[in-house]
Amino acid sequence: MKKMILSALLALSVNMAMAQGDVLQTATMKRDLTAKVNEQVYFPETVPPGNYSGITWLGGSLYAVVSDKSKRDGFFIFHINIDPDTGQISHAYSNEFRGEDYACRDNEGIAFVAQDSTIFISGETGNRILEYRLDNGHRTGRELAVPDSFRQSRPNLGFESLSYNPVTRRFWTVSESVLPMDGEACTQKNKKQNNLRLLCFDENLQFVAEYPYLMDYPVLKSKTANGYAMGVADVCALDDGRVIVLERELSVPKMKLGSFVNCKLYVVDPSEEGYSVALHKKLLTQFKTVIKGVKNDFANYEGMCLGPKLNDGSQVLVMICDSQDQKANVLHDYLRTVIIK
């Protein structure tokens, strides 16, 4: 009997070692990603002025886009042509809206679930993430089961982001800024690192996990900005379980000159262990747009999604900005791509 027990324990230890080896091998297979940021472009003759805040790929050249100030609840259909070799956007147009006669919920994030032919949209009004039919934009009556404690956000600082990955079958979202139950939020007069909660939901729309995420310290030195925002604008779920997080800092002085938007794309791996305070972050890339002298490429990027793969196998990340309806005829509805290898 003792020999049988010892043999069983030995076999169990071998199996555990093999399993641990598999885990380690899987972790090492997640190689570091690199990125190239393409030039931003805009198409004023074919893309109407908007407050575009989220984007998701439907396949081919089709994308669904949400606006946080659309007249009705629903989404726009965009056609975006991308060069298969460079990933640069060559043309884009939008001439269709799908939705119904409900008021807009300050729609911010959007995700496509192909197996169900449905769209999920996060709205900061009520902090609910509702499901819509792709063919007509009507609500299905289903929504992600967000715990009440995570819906209690500061005004206009709720669920700005949303992503779904068909391989992992997981939804991801995070509040734009710190939840009241977690303390103070970063402002131009109270500079601090925002401590956020990255939330995960399964394909049955149920909440499954939360992960601590700590933003960078702001780069703005002044405390007198006329307009300021510091938070996570969007997330993008990758096939290997990692998540790209868009940290966005925006500053607009009273005289407008010197305005900037600083965007940082970080990669986090929720499956990693060993973190003490928050998930480990790896900077993928960063870029800055400004209004400075004669230069004006100011773009408040709020949405991003995975797009097609290029001929060389590189992954395209598509980004869209909020021009506030091309405010003062100065801002533009920019699109841009980031090529990930």
Where are the regions a protein language model picked out?
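Sequence/structural signature of beta-propeller domains
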Residues: Q20-K341
